[in-house]
Amino acid sequence: LFEWVIENLSKNAVDAMGVDGGQITLHVEETDDRAIVEVSDTGKGIRKKDLRNVFRPGFTTKKRGWGLGLSLAKRIVEEYHHGKIWVKNSEVGKGTTFRIELKKKG
């Protein structure tokens, strides 16, 4: 299921960049107690007023879409992997970074 989360974030990044393209960066880091994954894009960014809703089921800014991808991603990360996912930063016209932190099993 975790692979699906990364796939969904990547597809959203492609959609955010549109036909002009851009860049997607996947950053993976390991610390003593956690694994960190960041998915960044150079897309249109998320408006401040929409940030609190991005993980809400049914919320979408796309013309086509159900608004379920990010809510399912959050559920998978939190309930199945006991981690956290959030928008690390987003700037309209410049892009967005989602961050996932997973605790390492000791």
For the regions a protein language model found, what residue spans apply to each?
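Detector for a conserved hydrophobic position within an alpha-helical segment of the HATPase_c
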Residues: 77-78
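Glycine-rich ATP-binding loops of the HATPase_c
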Residues: 81-89
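Short alpha-helical Gxxx[C/S/T] motif in the catalytic ATP-binding
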Residues: 69, 73
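Short conserved segment of the HATPase_c
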Residues: 46-57
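Short beta-strand/loop element within the Bergerat-fold HATPase_c
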Residues: 23-33
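Glycine-rich G1-box
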Residues: 44-45, 92
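Acidic ATP/Mg2+-coordinating residue in the GHKL
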Residues: 41
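Conserved polar catalytic motif of the HATPase_c/GHKL fold
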Residues: 7-12
